[in-house]
C-alpha cells in the first residue's frame, strides 16, 4: 500500500505542489505527502536534476509514488525513466492513469504544467492511487523491462 506521495514541479507551475498536497491531505489522510522545490517562480530548476534527485528517493521509500510536473510533462518523464527501477508515464486521461498502475506498476506519474488542467489532475491522481497492480503476467513484463535496462539492451 502506498504510504507516501512526493510532489515536485519545476519553475513553470510552482503552486502546483501546494494544490496537489492540499488535495492529497484532504482525500488521503493516511498518506504522508511531501513537496520538493521550487519555493518560488524565480528559482529555476532543470528537470534532469530534479528527476535524478527525486527518483533516487524511491529506492529509500519503497511504498511511495511521485507526482512530477514540468512544462510538457514529457521531459521530466524521460529524465525520470533514466533512473533504475523507475516506471514513469505522462498521464492525460483516466484510462492511462489506471493502466499504468494496473499493468505496469508505475511509481511515477507526470503531468504538464497547466493551471487549467488541475481539476482533471486531481481525478487522475485519485484513479492512479486507487488502482492496484494486477501482478500475474504483468509482473513478468515489468521484470523483462527492468532486466533490459540493467543490461543496457
Stretches found by the model and what they are:
Residues 26, 81-82, 102:
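Solvent-exposed polar/charged
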Residues 15-26:
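Short, solvent-exposed amphipathic alpha-helices that sit
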Residues 2, 62-64, 105:
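Short, high-confidence coil segments that cap the C-terminus of an alpha-helix
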Residues 30-44:
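A short beta-strand-loop structural module common to alpha/beta enzyme folds
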